[in-house]
Amino acid sequence: MVSKQQTMGFQTEVKQMLHLVVHSLYSNKEIFLRELISNASDALDKLRFLALSNGSLFENDSDLKISIQINEKLQTITISDNGIGLSWEEAVENLGTIAKSGTKEFISQLTGEQAKDSQLIGQFGVGFYSAFIVADKVTVKSRRAGLQPEDGIVWESKGDGEFTIGYEKKSTRGTEITLHLKPENDEFLSDWRIRGIISKYSDHICWPIVMKKLSEEGKESKEFETVNKATALWTLQKSEIGEEDYKQLYKHISHDYMDPLTWSHNHVEGKHEYITLLYIPAHAPFDLWQHEAKHGLKLYVKRVFIMDEATQFLPRYLRFIKGIVDASDLPLNISREILQDNKQVESIRAACTKRVLSMLEKMATNDKETYQKFWNEFGLVLKEGPIEDFANKEAIAKLLRFSTTASGSEKQEVSLEEYVSRMKEGQDKIYYITASSYNAAKNSPHLEIFRKKGIEVLLLSDKVDEWLVGYMNEFTGKKLQSISKGKVELGDDETSEQIKEQEKTLEPLIKHIKSVLNERVKDVLLTNRLTDSPACVVADEQDMGLEMQRILQAAGQQIPVSKPIFEINPEHALIKRLHDIQDDNQFELWVTMLFEQAVLAEGGQLDNPADFVNRVNRLLVSS
């Protein structure tokens, strides 16, 4: 008998979600069973974990399982588990409300592709609502483990914006979800249909899924039988597991709709015994760049589920990796805090990191096309590697890909090994330029002398690149050198001598330019790096790069004031023209315009763009 029954309205976001789920996934209805079984599996995991420290939660029933029963007469399917169960408050919170941000993300991710969208509901933790794809009414009976039978609850909704909830005595813990099927969905009253769906989506669930046995005539008996493999797949040897099994397990733990690119499954024995199963996804998750987004591996200890998103087993730059760690020697009551300072965890972390990098190296060597797909999805994250993982810096460096002046494309496809193999005779540095965009890098005046001499330059336009080159300053003994900082020395003694001679001849001009620019520059020098442009700005060798300064300023950070060096091309017609200008005001106009032009060409911003436009207009009129 139901007592203290209340009618409540769904949160606005839940109404939206219900509408979206039911109407966007109607042609892929069978996924409701996958989602409800997955939720039941989670409930069993949670109970077993909590029972490690409080055995009374088992209530003398430690035979954990998921049960599915069909009632053709009542047109219902009931999915029940003897897991952790729900209290009144948890039922209202979990079945009546969801995070607003989650709704917005869900809506933005919908594509109209049934296969893809069906996976999103699991990814966003709203799989329960898939029940309304096939049912016009859903009844949930539940009691949280440890509460009294009188604390059982019954929750019911027709998916129309409201739900009722009340207390109802329930002698057993756990949750029982009854779907009252819509008439057009009677196909799901077929025992064989349900078994087929379980085999397709949930065979790898490590808890037994039981249904009533069928006689040879196809009639139900009172006995139950397990209809899935009910094995912790990762505990088996590789030879016992099919490729499709690996893929299905990946989809279960990741809520991904695509197959993984590759995986690595290892049983480690010795001082520490553990199993790892690591997957490299085929595409980036929607929240890859959200700082608060959950990531990490599933942790088991002796086959007992301990926690999701155990971040301690991989560095942050590998946060896209999905998988499982099953350790034999960790304590069952281990907490996230204990994981931080555990020697065995450090050992497993080091091994997992090397395993992932090894998988990537193998892919990059043996299957360049697949590796390029990986890089297009995750390359930006991998570039964080040398910054935070000094021990594996060299291994990560081999995996990096870049755009270059030789590739002629914005696609990042060139490895550092390829670059080094193409270096000119006598070249001892790897040259690069950083900019705010690929086009800004590709068209930088700093490239002029390198193009003339046929020297390849890395074009770096990702924000992380500035930090990357700060931490990775050499590769296989070759120093990485910015072409927009300090002097450029390309081993051309004749040009250097010519510059020295010109410096003597043009000393009065250089002094005059310095007096005009005054505090805006650190120095004015003749350059050998330009062939087509009249001037450029560069950072001093010891100063922060100009692009890094812009990034930090945009982030609102205080940075030390550093002025650029203004370099002029003595062979350019505009610089030669400066010789002939006698009027100081005209000279100042020309010099200021050339300087600001160089700042813009470098990707910088002017304090007063209107002044620049006005100056250019005045010079056009007077020329």
Swiss-Prot record:
* SMART domains per record: HATPase_c (SM00387)
| Any one GO molecular-function label of the UniProt entry | unfolded protein binding
User: Per the record, which residues fall in region B?
Assistant: 337-550
Q: Where in the cell is it found?
A: Cytoplasm
SUPFAM superfamilies noted in UniProt: ATPase domain of HSP90 chaperone/DNA topoisomerase II/histidine kinase, HSP90 C-terminal domain, Ribosomal protein S5 domain 2-like
Instruction: Spell out the residue ranges making up region: C.
Output: 551-623
Pfam families per the UniProt record, alphabetical: HATPase_c_3, HSP90
Q: What UniProt keywords are attached to this protein's entry? A: ATP-binding, Chaperone, Cytoplasm, Nucleotide-binding, Stress response
Quaternary structure note = Homodimer.
The family classification in the record reads: Belongs to the heat shock protein 90 family.
Its job: Molecular chaperone. Has ATPase activity.
Q: What is this protein called?
A: Chaperone protein HtpG
Q: From what organism does this protein derive?
A: Legionella pneumophila (strain Lens)
Higher taxonomy = Bacteria, Pseudomonadati, Pseudomonadota, Gammaproteobacteria, Legionellales
